[in-house]
């Protein structure tokens, strides 16, 4: 019962997502696809200048937390889709309602 646990070093690079010019690949792919849609729809490449502040804003967010883009995308896939959140209470980690309605839950 005196077995010692082995220690293994976990490097920071093993926990980070892959970055492209300081932005995670998933977010970079979305921004590049959005740039393509802008060129196709507007047919003027000067509107691509709008994406430069978005790119640098994404870099600023990712400087603080490498997984921030993944957290936002996960939110959009779960709670962002609940358009009837006011009626049913939305997506929550807790099974209990956060705030109880004035008329009670489930009573007409």
Curated annotation (Swiss-Prot):
One Gene Ontology CC term in the entry: type IV secretion system complex
Biological process (GO), any one: protein secretion by the type IV secretion system
Keywords assigned: Crown gall tumor, Membrane, Plasmid, Transmembrane, Transmembrane helix
Keyword Membrane found: yes
Source superkingdom: Bacteria
InterPro entries xref list: T4SS_VirB3/TrbD/AvhB
Membrane spanning residue stretches: 22-42
Places the protein is found: Membrane
Role description: VirB proteins are suggested to act at the bacterial surface and there play an important role in directing T-DNA transfer to plant cells.
Protein name in the entry: Protein virB3
Organism from which the protein derives: Agrobacterium fabrum (strain C58 / ATCC 33970) (Agrobacterium tumefaciens (strain C58))
Name of the gene encoding the protein in the UniProt record: virB3
